[in-house]
């Protein structure tokens, strides 16, 4: 479905994209057209030019699904501890030809330092051009004890600072910043009307994401006024360890 036009790939099919009845599992968007975290993960993975961690080899790869060749790119891998402190940074120059996957030998393994506090750590990836413009990013929550993420439960609650702009009657632009010294994990944005009902469907430029200390992200939201029942909606912000707040 996504890779069928590639010379070296046989195609990829999602099973399944949506549920035919209300369900908590097996869907990228649910019965009511709400996009799940899986939707945003799949969309990230399908970027035309993409940086990723190969879970099997633990190497970092640059995937180019376009027909263009990119020269003098810089791939950066940051290892962070559970508190979001950077403990190691590695970079690698890379050329990416069209319809190719390049493994970065200099970033072959995670090489987790022994001074990581506990088991949980993060990997933050960035692919930039020769002018340092960001082309792709990625983020992974991992553990030295594979699959054991229980240490995340020790993270304290944090507040996320936000500013809201309404450039149009059916759109909002949110700028979110983590001003705390602790990561804000799995931030979820949920558009609602004054009576507390969800607005669906909604187009979020991003959702279900993490913000490290000091990190900022801009999210654009669009909807149809008919789906908001002609009301002025607001955004409910929640997260794994994020204090609930309302953005108007």
Predicted regions and their residues:
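Short beta-strand-to-loop capping motifs
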Residues: 223-225
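Carbohydrate-binding surfaces of carbohydrate-active enzymes
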Residues: 1-206, 212-221, 230, 234
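Conserved recognition-core residues within compact binding domains
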Residues: 240
């Amino acid at each position: 479905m996504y890779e069928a036009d590639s010379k070296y790939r046989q195609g990829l099919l999602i099973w399944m994209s949506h549920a035919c009845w209300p369900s908590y599992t097996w869907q990228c968007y649910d019965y009511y057209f709400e996009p799940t975290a899986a939707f945003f993960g799949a969309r990230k993975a399908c970027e035309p030019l993409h940086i990723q961690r190969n879970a099997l080899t633990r190497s970092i790869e640059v995937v180019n699904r376009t027909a263009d060749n990119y020269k003098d790119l810089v791939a950066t891998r940051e290892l962070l501890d559970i508190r979001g402190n950077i403990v190691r940074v590695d970079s690698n120059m890379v050329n990416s030809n069209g319809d190719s996957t390049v493994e970065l030998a200099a970033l072959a393994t995670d090489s987790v330092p022994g001074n990581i506090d506990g088991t949980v750590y993060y990997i933050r990836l960035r692919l930039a051009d020769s002018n340092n413009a960001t082309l792709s990013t990625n983020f992974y929550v991992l553990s030295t004890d594979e699959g054991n993420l229980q240490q995340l439960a020790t993270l304290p609650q944090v507040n996320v600072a936000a500013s809201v702009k309404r450039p149009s009657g059916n759109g909002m632009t949110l700028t979110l910043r983590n001003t705390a010294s602790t990561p804000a994990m799995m931030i979820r944005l949920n558009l609602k009307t004054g009576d507390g009902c969800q607005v669906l469907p909604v187009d979020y430029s991003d959702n279900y994401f993490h913000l490290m200390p000091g990190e900022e992200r801009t999210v654009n939201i669009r909807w149809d006024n008919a789906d908001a029942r002609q009301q002025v909606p607001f955004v409910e912000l929640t997260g794994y360890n994020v204090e609930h707040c309302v953005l108007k």
